[in-house]
Curated annotation (Swiss-Prot):
Gene3D superfamilies named among the record's database cross-references: Ribulose bisphosphate carboxylase, large subunit, C-terminal domain (3.20.20.110), RuBisCO large subunit, N-terminal domain (3.30.70.150)
EC number: 4.1.1.39
Known role: RuBisCO catalyzes two reactions: the carboxylation of D-ribulose 1,5-bisphosphate, the primary event in carbon dioxide fixation, as well as the oxidative fragmentation of the pentose substrate in the photorespiration process. Both reactions occur simultaneously and in competition at the same active site.
Binding-site residues, substrate: 114, 164, 168, 286, 318, 370
Protein name, as recorded: Ribulose bisphosphate carboxylase large chain
Keyword Metal-binding part of the UniProt annotation: yes
Molecular function in Gene Ontology: magnesium ion binding; monooxygenase activity; ribulose-bisphosphate carboxylase activity
Biological process terms in GO annotation: photorespiration; reductive pentose-phosphate cycle
Origin: domain of life: Eukaryota
Active site: 166 (proton acceptor), 285 (proton acceptor)
Primary localization class, coarse: plastid
Cofactor binding mode and count: Binds 1 Mg(2+) ion per subunit.
Length: 441
């Protein structure tokens, strides 16, 4: 007589549980599942739940040594996607104990690990995650958050202005610092290292940090405003990254920057902890996000990457523009912008928000609009993003025919004009162009 029946059995017998009541401590996921032809959606949904939690392809002897009921992921809901053939939203609940505390890395290894290569699925996309309060409380989150940043910078009641220094590659450190100075002197709050600028032969990081710090102090002295430059600390190893952050702090720089997807969540969380301990703000760039989030039916939606970043830690994150050169729909973008900034966000499917998310006093992140925007977009941007945002004009500053400083002046003047017009109750959508024309006289 055998102890148990080996062999392959349907996942749905164990992992499809439509009657399950979700717990407040569960991590909930909404997956867009495209099963292979002939695979029923229940089986596909259950397969996702199994493969991203306790399951393997057969019953194993060691299952008897643990409580599956306590540790298994469960597919508790399925709905067909309107307008798509053979696509379903599968809702999966994961018990909290499956995840290491304070580790975005571990959360993703489970939820979006092997399961994405699964044979029974043609494609799989993680659309949203509900992160329970009990798990959020194990994370530090953003080093400082929106309010503390405003207090540090002494800038209130308007979006902040930035500019990426171009040409992104090829300038010497001295000329790079000069461009930084001109932009800050003209009226921007921040300038930015491009995400590709790390420490290349034509400009080593230490030289760049030095000349940028000089530019910041000079511009501060002349304008009486606090200025910053996002010093990109991204590096090939975590140790080197922290070394760069330490040097930035020694120079008295207010903010450093990290590419969180190429750098990885482990490195990012380390840097975020360092930044909080040492009073540095942290600007996050999302290079590589489109590799993960651009396909509609496979990968994961950017709102998930944004939530993960808020847990891992960052004070600014690039979030699309709605109007510039890169893709992004307005309502959907505003959905994850709110997920970054607000304390509590209600479920709202029209904005792509599948779950109500409570952030319980985890600091907020400023969304950064960047990529192909310029001064004529200013009315739309102030209206769409509101005060709590950073508007970044790279070519839209440095492309000014009179040079960098006048480009910076133009952006600052346009911003102040739009904010004032809005505060006076004028309709930015309708009168935007007129407001800008008046301002530039």
């Amino acid at each position: 007589s055998v102890g148990f029946k080996a062999g392959v059995k349907d996942y749905k017998l164990t992992y499809y549980t439509p009657e399950y009541e979700t717990k407040d401590t569960d991590i909930l996921a909404a997956f867009r599942v495209t099963p292979q032809p002939g695979v029923p959606p229940e089986e596909a949904g259950a397969a996702v739940a199994a493969e991203s939690s306790t399951g393997t392809w057969t019953t194993v002897w060691t299952d008897g040594l643990t409580s599956l009921d306590r540790y298994k992921g469960r597919c508790y809901g399925l709905e067909p996607v309107a307008g798509e053939e053979n696509q379903y939203i599968a809702y999966v609940a994961y018990p909290l104990d499956l995840f290491e505390e304070g580790s975005v890395t571990n959360m993703f290894t489970s939820i979006v690990g092997n399961v994405f290569g699964f044979k029974a699925l043609r494609a799989l996309r993680l659309e949203d995650l509900r992160i329970p309060v009990s798990y959020i409380k194990t994370f530090q989150g953003p080093p400082h958050g929106i309010q503390v940043e405003r207090d540090k910078l002494n800038k209130y009641g308007r979006p902040l202005l930035g500019c990426t220094i171009k040409p992104k590659l090829g300038l010497s450190a001295k000329n790079y610092g000069r461009a930084v100075y001109e932009c800050l002197r003209g009226g921007l709050d921040f300038t930015k290292d491009d995400e590709n600028v790390n420490s290349q032969p034509f400009m080593r990081w230490r030289d760049r940090f030095l000349f940028c710090a000089e530019a910041i102090y000079k511009a501060q002295a002349e304008t009486g405003e606090i200025k910053g430059h996002y010093l990109n600390a991204t590096a090939g190893t975590c140790e080197e990254m922290i070394k760069r952050a330490v040097f930035a702090r020694e120079l008295g720089a207010p903010i450093v920057m990290h590419d969180y997807l190429t750098g990885g969540f482990t490195a990012n969380t380390s840097l975020a902890h360092y930044c909080r301990d040492n009073g540095l703000l942290l600007h996050i760039h999302r290079a590589m996000h489109a590799v993960i989030d651009r396909q509609k039916n496979h990968g994961m939606h950017f709102r998930v990457l944004a939530k993960a970043l808020r847990l891992s830690g960052g004070d600014h994150i690039h979030a699309g523009t709605v109007v510039g050169k890169l893709e992004g729909e307005r309502e959907i973008t505003l959905g994850f912008v709110d997920l970054l900034r607000d304390d509590f966000v209600e479920k709202d499917r029209s904005r792509g928000i599948y779950f109500t998310q409570d952030w319980v006093s985890l600091p907020g992140v400023l969304p950064v609009a960047s990529g192909g925007i310029h001064v004529w977009h200013m009315p739309a941007l102030t209206e769409i993003f509101g005060d709590d945002s950073v508007l970044q004009f790279g070519g839209g500053t440095l492309g000014h025919p009179w040079g960098n400083a006048p480009g910076a002046v133009a952006n600052r003047v346009a911003l102040e004009a739009c904010v004032q017009a809005r505060n006076e109750g004028r309709d930015l959508a309708r009168e935007g162009n007129e407001i800008i024309r008046q301002a530039c006289k």
